[in-house]
Curated annotation (Swiss-Prot):
The protein's name: Transmembrane gamma-carboxyglutamic acid protein 2
Top-level taxon: Eukaryota
Extracellular topology ranges: 52-111
Encoding gene per record: Prrg2
Source organism: Mus musculus (Mouse)
Chief location bin: membrane
The organism's taxonomic lineage, starting at the top: Eukaryota, Metazoa, Chordata, Craniata, Vertebrata
Gla domain mapped to chain residues: 52-98
Length: 198
């Protein structure tokens, strides 16, 4: 069952691609080419928005100062293309903000944001890398130190565990207690009666 639907799809795809009827070719040719009024409306129509120096058929459309130099930075050649006169171009170029002589230009916010973000990210990554390196190095040095102590090559000056104070001597045995003389060697006092007074 799985093979039959896929075979049907392959057959339909090949039949569509290999269809060479003359009626179909004529319709495709008519769809590609436009009539003269439609082509003219594409080139100079008001529906198109100028795209400021981005593939907008500049060779066929007249130069526009706003599009060429005010919306974007332009070069001397683009300004010369608009003015078509060296004296007018010189006058404009002296007052133009981005003329290469300095001047106050606008801040490129996108470039500034990308630069700051990448700088901060670089600092954070460098900090994390340094932290990881130091942590790994400290762990490795501790591991080497314990291995050397176990083999007896390094004897620590101060013991790792503090020594407990010596235990007090335990109680003497019965024989030792009888042999020793001391303050408490006297026999107990005699008991007068086993009864308690009421």
């Amino acid at each position: 069952m799985r093979g039959r639907p896929s075979l049907l799809l392959v057959y339909m795809g090949l039949a569509t691609c290999l269809d060479t009827s003359p009626h179909r070719e004529q319709n495709q040719v008519l769809d590609i080419f436009l009539d003269a009024p439609e082509a003219q409306s594409f080139l100079v129509g008001r529906r198109r928005f100028p795209r400021a120096n981005h593939w907008d058929l500049e060779l066929l459309t007249p130069g526009n100062l706003e599009r060429e130099c005010l919306e974007e930075r332009c070069s001397w050649e683009e300004a010369r293309e608009y003015f078509e006169d060296n004296t007018l171009t010189e006058r404009f170029w002296e007052s133009y903000t981005y003329n290469g002589k300095g001047g106050r230009g606008r801040v490129d916010v996108a470039g500034l944001a990308v630069g700051l973000t990448s700088g901060i990210l670089l600092i954070v990554l460098a900090g994390l890398g340094a932290f990881w390196y130091l942590h790994y190095r400290r762990r490795r040095l501790r591991g080497q130190e314990s291995c050397l102590q176990e083999t007896g090559l390094i004897i620590p000056l101060s013991p790792q565990t503090p020594q407990s104070p010596p235990l007090p001597p335990g109680l003497p045995t019965y024989e030792q207690a009888l042999a020793a003389s001391g303050v408490h060697d006297a026999p107990p006092p005699p008991y007068s009666s086993l009864r308690r007074p009421h």
